[in-house]
Amino acid sequence: MRVIRLFFILILLMALLPSVVRAEEPIITADAAILIEATTGRVLWEKEGEARHYPASMTKMMTTILLLENIDPAEEIFISPQAAMTENTSLGIKAGERLTAKELTTGMMMVSDNGAAVAIAEAMDGDTATFAKRMNAKAKEIGMENTNFVNPNGLTDPNHYSTPHDIARLARYAMENDDFRQIVQREKETIYWSYPNGRFKNVINTNELLGNYEGITGVKTGWTNAAGGCLTASAKRNGLKLIAVVMHSKTEEDRFSDMRKILDYGFQHVHMVHGFSKEELSRRIFIVDGRMGTTVARPIEDVEYPLMDGEDPSHCSIAYDAPRIVTAPVSGKDVGKVIIKYDDKPVGSVALHSERVEEGFSIGSFIVSVFGWML
């Protein structure tokens, strides 16, 4: 009889085991979400990560990075009547006013001002439609494969969409920019106008995780009736950098509780292991542009792999995706990447950065080196 009881207990435990494993994964209200490791871009967990949804104000991450890469932060931006009349100008900007690019962008990101995004688009390209073309070109450049922008602020439009994975790609790219990181990690700020002189406004970041979640470093909220609750968040603990995105959470508050569950899951079940030093991954690349030369390309930092609980570091490998010959100028630029694989499947990548250029070698050595590499 005792043996029979033990047998049935064992059967019961085996039946419960799958549900116990599944229970470890985050249970969220959002229709779609993703968690990636920021350094490599490896997808660690997802729920409909490639599904299209309205990105709402997470769109403003693209508007911000385009401004930071193309406009002097001290340049003054004029507020047009169209910008001032845009739905939800939470900064309270008015037609005829002026703010520096830095102040306007900071205010836009912290309190999600839609009119500020329009003013930025007009300052850069004259109108929002032309600016949207710039946004889509940048999206393609950074690998956002299933995204289309039609405005700079994320107001609902049937043709304005993205996916959790694409938004995570955008956040990963943008968080490499020092000015962007400084903006999105601020809890409070005072925004000053250039004209009228003396006007200012104290603002509080709409990202409620700032100051309330260990290791949080950004990044952007979003909400419309059609988009539901949206949130992109980044956090760092013990050297592990995570980026997560939720789209179409049921309520504005649910997006924060959903995000906590996802980030908690990542920090509990993911760890970084050392792979290769940046010196080990150095790559000599030839430069041809009048005079010939070479550049040394390597990752900016030593390469580490993100592994889930139970994964074996010996299953990790790398491959290069970089040309052997490039045209100048390349100094200080990314010239390829190291592909990180697990069980021979690509799971992430790290950029190869051109650190220095050496000029002056013979055509003979060039031919021998290049053709020797090909052989």
What are these regions (language model features)?
Residues 6, 25-31, 225-229:
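Short, flexible loop/turn motifs enriched in small residues
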Residues 3-4, 55, 101, 363, ...:
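Structural motif marking the loop-to-transmembrane transition
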Residues 145, 158-161, 165-375:
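Domain-terminus/edge residues, biased toward the C-terminal soluble/receptor-binding domains
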Residues 2-23:
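Sec-dependent N-terminal signal peptides of Gram-positive bacterial secreted proteins and lipoproteins
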Residues 14, 24-26, 235, 328-329:
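Sterically constrained small-residue positions within well-ordered secondary structures
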Residues 15-18, 73, 195, 274:
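Residues in and immediately flanking transmembrane alpha helices
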Residues 21-183, 193:
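Active-site-adjacent loops and short helices of periplasmic peptidoglycan-processing enzymes
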Residues 3-6, 61, 237:
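Hydrophobic alpha-helical segments, especially transmembrane helices
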